[in-house]
Amino acid sequence: MAKLKLPFALCFSSFLLFFTLVLSSSVFSPIDHYLINCGSHGSTVDLDHRRFVGDSNSPLLSSSGGESLAVSNPLPGSSPIYHTGRVFTRPSKYVFSIRDPGAHLVRLHFQVLNTGLDYSNAQFYVLANGYLLLDSSSIEKTWNSGVIKEYIIRVDSDKLVITFVPVKKSKFAFVNAIEVISAPKDLVADLAQYVSSEKNEQISGLLKNGFETVHRVSVGGPKVTPFNDSLWRTWLPDDEFLKSHDDSLSKVYYSGHIQYQNGGASREVGPDNMYNTARIIKSSSDSIPNVNMSWAFPVDEGYKYLVRMHFCDIASVARGMLYFNVYVNGYMAYENLDLTMITGILASPFYADFVVDEGLSGVLTVSVGPSNMSETRAVDAILNGVEIMKINNSVGSFDGEFCAHSVLKTWRTGNGGVVLFLLAAVFLLLTATMLIKRRSSEIGDSIVWSRLPMEIPDAISKRYNQLSSSKV
């Protein structure tokens, strides 16, 4: 299998000449910015000081707008957006006008309200512009304590339609709050590295897909709340996912300023509070530790995933002293990674995107460790953050094999057995067709993007140059 190497002067000389050493100081202000408090008649300020607008009598909500619910005795300290909710007994939709076409963040908030409603009858799907976002059966065990589902969806029309569909007429759907926010242009790049047991190659066309955030962790640091993130994200501590324990592993905290640069990772890609903490491997003697730091994340089988690893050298005392390898699902993704070769300076953030299959038995692993260029008495590996995003499958679903069209068609026909039989037959036919095609083509040709015959340093330079040009 090909390994990814980072040659020194040749590949990055032109890139470093272009790289601007000016800190990115612009503040992101989304053009489309909807914060909806479902079931409420007025505005509500949440715990992160954001104002959510009630949807009662709102033009965003379709005529079959369901019923609003409210709790009379909310739990102390709970967010006000979970004091109300809206229940739907038939397909109902929110229609958002879009002024800024492109990628949008969509967050759906669910929490059971203590109103006497029997939530065992809450069985539903959530659709958005042809995507099937959610089958409620996948979250029903956790919605008592609150669930936030986050997606990145490309919207090329002037409308984003989010539809709630009960599985049948005796069931209902519910939601507590909805966020729709236009994403910054640099949030998702079109290029990534496809890593598997057989291949390690560049692919393009990533932006044609949708994404669901599955895990977002700050490595070595505390929880980062939405108040401290310019895109109002939550970054959880990594402790429960860390699988490595060795005396050479430690946490570091950086009290200085993170050096954001034009063309590099922006604050919207990752906040200061994530980049100024990390876990490192460091040799304290004349030998380099023979150990990797590894994390294991549970994921759903049958999907591909975008794995984003965040790096910021906040631990080295000088440039050119940190070299390490990066692995995804046990396969080499980067060899001899030198962060300052890419960024030019210390404490400047960089991220790398990888596309992988789910791994073994629904577990996805990432690791960093010393390389054959690592030095003694120096930092030998570092990681600041990890994001794992599910990529929609071939029918546009993030949660099962049904597509959005099938869900709506099933409801319109009264959930009849004939329709379910036909859907099952169509699914079996599609599965057989896909298996036949898979046997006659390579793995890389079955995904929706195309491969690029280029070296990774050129791809990184291209990504950074494109982002810099878009900011000018």
Predicted regions and their residues:
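Compositionally biased, intrinsically disordered or flexible polar/acidic segments
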Residues: 2-472
